Amino acid sequence: MLTTTLFRSIASCEINAWQDMYSAAGHELSDQFGIKVFSMGSACISLVKNIDILAFNRVIGLGLFQTATEEMVDNIISKYKNAGIKRFFIQIHPEAAPPQLKDWFAQRNIVHYNNWVKHYRGVENPPVVETELEIREVKSKDDVDRFGEIITLSFEWPDEMRLWFEHLVGRKCWKTYLALDGDRAVAAASMYVKDDCGWLSFASTLPDYRGKGAQTALIARRIQDAAELGCKVLTVETAEDNEEKRSQSLQNIQKMGFEVAFVRPNFLWKAE
């Protein structure tokens, strides 16, 4: 059951992971991409000026642990405007306060765009997945290069971003993985672990290997590793699965025992 304590744990874990992800970029990449991260109340505000990808230009945690104000909303908009960013997301948790948040958004032309679904599960009874693929942690220089390459290719993100993801390899609190078919790396994934919570992220598979079980094998490995690290709960987020747009990621994680924690709406601001 998703208790208040558990809800706060998985929400905090995600915020901590994203903050550390941006710190991992380092000064050179931060200057190259225009990366900045701010805290405002309980919100984590991330800006990547030179990469127009909503996943990296977004606000999470607004009104979650500290009640939001209209001034906060205005200040958030100002930060993105001043950085020259043309659009960004604000993601709202079900427990975000005050209830007037969505009214404040509407008054500022911040509109509902879509929903993402937050899932969770314990680490007990790790699933056993039969696969011919080799699942291993990223350690060698060749593996590091392939890890970043698979993520950027799979998500169709700019190639220069691969260095950013490669900086996660070996970083404190992070575990990074590859799935290989023989000598060919075909899928990648990561996990951020802090205290008793783990955040699964950057699940990516090359197009010609999708639907062949790489991600279920990577999920199983991360559940097993999380248990060994002393985690009690894991969390992951996917797009919604509906008739208009199917979500293979959502189907994969629910098959592996994850339950829905909550549906989180994404609100979009665009420069006029």
What are these regions (language model features)?
Residues 27-38, 86, 113-115, 168-178, ...:
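A short helix-loop-beta-strand connector motif used in the catalytic cores of GNAT acetyltransferases and
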